Amino acid sequence: STLSSNDAKVVDGKATPLGSFPHVKRAGDFLYVSGTSSRRPDNTIAGAELDSTS
């Protein structure tokens, strides 16, 4: 889908933003992409494991 001049979008299938920030925001000719991480849609972190023995 395309973004109009001052539109914002949260991308389906990606982790829900932790704050009130969209994944993508267009402002005129500028396109802003929010910081991304290895957080999965289920809020687990790729490559991180829980050590339950401690």
UniProtKB/Swiss-Prot annotation:
Known partners and oligomeric status: Homohexamer.
Disulfide pairings: none
UniProt protein name: 2-aminomuconate deaminase
EC number: 3.5.99.5
pH-dependent activity: Optimum pH is 6.6.
Keyword Acetylation: no
Keyword hit for Ribosomal protein: no
Gene3D superfamilies: RutC-like
Enzyme class: hydrolase
Pathway(s) it belongs to: Xenobiotic degradation; nitrobenzene degradation
InterPro entries recorded: RutC-like_sf
Protein role: Converts 2-aminomuconate to 4-oxalocrotonate, an intermediate step in the biodegradation of nitrobenzene.
Catalysed transformations (reactions): (2Z,4E)-2-aminomuconate + H2O = (3E)-2-oxohex-3-enedioate + NH4(+)
Domain of life the protein comes from: Bacteria
Record keywords, A-Z: Hydrolase
GO molecular function: 2-aminomuconate deaminase activity
